Amino acid sequence: MNYKDAGVNIDEGNKLVEMIKPIAKKTLTDNVLEGIGGFAALFEIKNYKNPVIVSSTDGVGTKLKIAFMMDKHDTVGIDLVAMCVNDIIVTGAKPLFFLDYFATGKLKSEVAVEVIKGIAEGCKIAGCALIGGETAELPGFYKEGEYDLAGFCVGIVEKEELIDTKSIKEGDAIIGLASSGIHSNGYSLVRKVFFEKNNFSVKDFIPELGMNLGDALLTPTKIYVKSIEALKELKIKGMAHITGGGFIDNIPRILRKSIAAKINKGSWKIPTIFNLIQRLGDIEEREMYRTFNMGIGMVVIVDPSDVDKALEKLNGIGEKAYVIGEIVESEGGVIL
């Protein structure tokens, strides 16, 4: 008996590594001192006076179930990168490098390489290097054809350039940056609504969406790195990545208890997919705002005097941005 008899194919793993190398190489920067395949990756920090390292880890959640149903694996890697780098940039940091963890019951290189291509694409969009990862073949641990993903990102910022959310005060403006869709949160509810309660198939064409349901649900999470870079000349007082917990749980994470975010509903167009979920699932409005991004994937808080400049900068790079509310004196939280 050998390891392959037990369900672990080392040769398949080595084959995948060779397939990954040229993909990852396209993301590398001059700071990366060694290529893919070593025991550890080396990254040189240059031109910083008082650097602060910022880290984040995340996954894609049950959005992966949609990828399995569609047998489409080239976009969930973008989601993985987005979930990590969008958390990094709210501190004022820029992403430096990324690592991934791919685990499956039986390794299929053709599937894994599609996932890695998506991760590499996400890294290119975010301007960070894919410097390593782990592929784990775990017989009997996952259902056939399924896998799980985790991502790890490290960024950097000068200490004096860290965003200080303590400066947020009454009257400050809340700018919302448009999402690309559902992003990567709320998919357990999404699947319940569409597939269990209403018996949809991922292949069903949805006239309101103009596409098949599966394609709409797999729309990759938007990466906001370049959008936030466009605002670097302005004083950003705070940012919130609208992920699990939606508006209700994420915006208060950057607010003192004596102030609240007053959101002006109707100041942006809520994408059709959310209206569909709410109607088909008979979901209360506040629950929608606590589960989904509702069309706003990133919130930026600035002084009112900086609003016009911020919108000009964002619109100039093709970013859809809206003034969606203001900071008010209150017991904290979000006022809809």
UniProtKB/Swiss-Prot annotation:
Catalytic activity: 2-formamido-N(1)-(5-O-phospho-beta-D-ribosyl)acetamidine + ATP = 5-amino-1-(5-phospho-beta-D-ribosyl)imidazole + ADP + phosphate + H(+)
Protein location: Cytoplasm
Keyword Mitochondrion: no
UniProt similarity note: Belongs to the AIR synthase family.
Metabolic or biological pathway: Purine metabolism; IMP biosynthesis via de novo pathway; 5-amino-1-(5-phospho-D-ribosyl)imidazole from N(2)-formyl-N(1)-(5-phospho-D-ribosyl)glycinamide: step 2/2
Entry keyword set: ATP-binding, Cytoplasm, Ligase, Nucleotide-binding, Purine biosynthesis
Gene3D superfamilies given in the database record: PurM-like C-terminal domain, PurM-like, N-terminal domain
GO cellular component, one term: cytosol
InterPro entries: PurM-like_C_dom, PurM-like_C_sf, PurM-like_N, PurM-like_N_sf, PurM_cligase
Pfam families from the UniProt entry: AIRS, AIRS_C
Example GO molecular function: phosphoribosylformylglycinamidine cyclo-ligase activity
Protein name: Phosphoribosylformylglycinamidine cyclo-ligase
EC number from the UniProt entry: 6.3.3.1
CDD domains per record: PurM (cd02196)
Major enzyme class: ligase
Location (main, coarse): cytoplasm
Swiss-Prot/TrEMBL GO biological process terms: 'de novo' IMP biosynthetic process; adenine biosynthetic process
Organism of derivation: Thermoanaerobacter pseudethanolicus (strain ATCC 33223 / 39E) (Clostridium thermohydrosulfuricum)
